[in-house]
């Protein structure tokens, strides 16, 4: 009787673990970033390239004012990049489920409500100035459950109606930055 109980318990344990063992692991192969604004340099540095369900990839987004004049940047939730997500199309419809990028700033902001099922946002914009030579940076994480498979993912605003904007004078213009993240599945030993 004890042997049967042991065999049953062992089989259930192995079956339970098989889902975890079979989860795909990914690697960030490449990131590209640019902005269409001459006086702003936008770059993304991959800090942790491997991504699984338990361990996220980590990126540092950097925005630098390379011009001679101050630039005001306006966004929602957190400054300067706002709430962002990844989609497999740069022109994604954000009403379709996206892979959210998480940030410690989301947790500490009183303008962002993070829930297991998504995020909420206080619609009050945040405007700050980036002086010449000054940099703003933010660390983001991409968890394995947010990845839908291999391919190139594009960073987009989490909400369509919260596009960032910038001003060098009195007129605000949509802030267009572009970032692509190429993700590859890692080779795994057969189970």
Residue ranges and their predicted role:
Residues 1-85, 90-99, 116, 120-191:
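Hydrophobic alpha-helical segments
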Residues 107-116:
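Short, basic/aromatic beta-hairpin or loop at an interaction surface
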């Amino acid at each position: 009787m004890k042997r049967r109980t042991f065999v049953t318990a062992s089989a259930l344990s192995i079956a339970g673990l098989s889902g975890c063992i079979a989860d795909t692991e990914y690697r960030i192969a490449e990131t590209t970033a640019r902005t269409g604004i001459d006086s702003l340099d936008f770059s993304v540095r991959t800090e942790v390239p491997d991504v699984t369900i338990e361990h996220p990839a980590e990126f540092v987004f950097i925005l630098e004012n390379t011009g001679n004049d101050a630039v005001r940047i306006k966004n929602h939730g957190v400054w300067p990049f706002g709430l962002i997500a990844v989609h497999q199309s740069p022109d994604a419809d954000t009403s379709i489920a996206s892979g959210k990028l998480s940030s410690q700033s989301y947790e500490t902001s009183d303008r962002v409500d993070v829930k297991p099922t998504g995020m909420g946002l206080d619609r009050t914009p945040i405007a700050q100035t980036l002086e010449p030579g000054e940099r703003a940076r933010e660390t983001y994480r991409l968890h394995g459950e947010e990845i839908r498979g291999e391919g190139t993912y594009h960073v987009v605003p989490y909400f369509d109606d919260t596009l960032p904007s910038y001003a060098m004078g009195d007129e605000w213009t949509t802030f267009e930055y572009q970032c692509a993240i190429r993700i590859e599945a890692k080779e795994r030993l057969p189970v």
